[in-house]
Swiss-Prot record:
Belongs to the universal ribosomal protein uS9 family. It comes from the Bacteria. The gene is rpsI. Gene3D superfamilies: 3.30.230.10. Residues 111-130 have a biased composition (Basic residues). Keywords: Ribonucleoprotein, Ribosomal protein. One of its GO terms (molecular function) is RNA binding. This is Small ribosomal subunit protein uS9. Residues 105-130 are annotated as: Disordered.
Length: 130
């Protein structure tokens, strides 16, 4: 383990990510697997890398994340928030840049609960006139 580690927690939908940033060459490891192997989608990889690319710190830090719960999209969002928070611990001067881009805001949108009498949150059973 590295001597200096910066920590950030990210949440999105039902996913929770614990992110550790340490000085390194820019490797991103998620649940002990490389980023490209874990997600397999370029769009999700881009989402995870956004805070690093915006601040120009992609090659300065190695990122290690443990993420659980939710789906892959929620997990990517949780890791993104965790990375942004860890970067602020590493360098508080990055805060205005990340804040302006909206990377420090926890996305409050959650799955709406199912109501009785309906099939899903809003989907009503099929209606027959006759």
């Amino acid at each position: 383990m590295a001597k200096v580690m910066f920590y950030g927690t990210g949440r999105r939908k039902n996913a929770i990510a614990r992110v550790f940033a340490m000085p390194g060459e820019g490797r991103i490891i998620i649940n002990n697997r490389p980023l490209s192997e874990y997600f397999g989608r370029k769009t999700l990889e881009t989402i995870v890398r956004q805070p690093l690319d915006l601040t120009g710190t992609a090659s300065r830090f190695d990122i290690m994340a443990k993420v659980q719960g939710g789906g892959i999209s929620g997990q990517a969002g949780a890791i993104k928030l965790g990375i942004a928070r860890a970067l602020i611990q590493a360098d508080p001067n990055l805060r205005p840049v990340l804040k302006k881009a909206g990377f420090l805001t926890r996305d409050p949108r959650m799955k709406e609960r199912r109501k009785y009498g309906l099939k899903k949150a809003r989907r009503a059973p099929q209606y027959s006139k006759r």
